[in-house]
Amino acid sequence: MTTNHSLDIPEGFILHELSPQSEQFLTMLGPWYYKNVPTDNGHVERVFGIRIEPKHTNIWGTAHGGMLISMADSALGYNLSRSTEPPQKLVTVHLSSDFMASPKPNDWVETEFRISKIGKRMSFAECSLKVGNKIMLRTSGVFTVLNQLKKVQND
């Protein structure tokens, strides 16, 4: 049985084509959608979205927390890496998440991203996952620049 993922996707969102070679984990969790939204500071935020399916749920029938954290981590890393020119390769150093509510099957979940600080070696940001205007998950993340990480490991 195939699922038509184009049904019930909010206007403006398009399917996020993932590389099966390099993004197998996210491919397994998808399908992911996105839209690019201009910000006040002249950057573009990529808002990610997903329709919760039964495969995304835990034993209680709500969205699995690990899947939600993966979504927040991906949105944080993607948007932070592209907030500088040129874009930087970043890896997660720390995530802290608060579960506020539980998305259910057929809920549409979107990311909302905010930069806290961008430094030479570390960057900090926050991401909320929302169903409509209701916050489901609040995550703060710390990321390091990949070439800086290699430099520290080699010292």
Where do the model's predicted regions map?
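Terminal targeting signals and extreme-terminal segments of soluble enzymes
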Residues: 1-155
